[in-house]
């Protein structure tokens, strides 16, 4: 009950109690169980498939709250990854329900900095921050020349932290599987 109940403020200003639905509870429990019982990276990882509007963001909150409440799992670094500004704003508001500070990553450099620490913190980042890009021409120069070159292809982000106590929870992951992100 402690990890699967949150209080949220609505747009009208009312505070409401939100209780985890069965499918959210089941998914969150399975994630926690896999982290505890999995012997390999593969057996500790997985995919949770939710339909649109089924409460993916809240499921992520319930997982995080379960982890923070468990003495053997509370030291995990959490990385909540999304792919759109509006989704980041929604997830940011929902992530505050976990409790504690939520770091909103604004740049690739800041992402490297936060990932490289041993802190068991909560970080939110947009997926494109994992790409290393080097601009060939600034937008101003390209505009003056009348040349709009395609953005340069991203380079591999590389390993920043070798800890196995990092959890990535990716919202709308299917949209990252095309173009330079896939």
Question: What residue ranges belong to the model's regions?
Answer:
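SF2 helicase catalytic motif II
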Residues: 142-150, 155-182
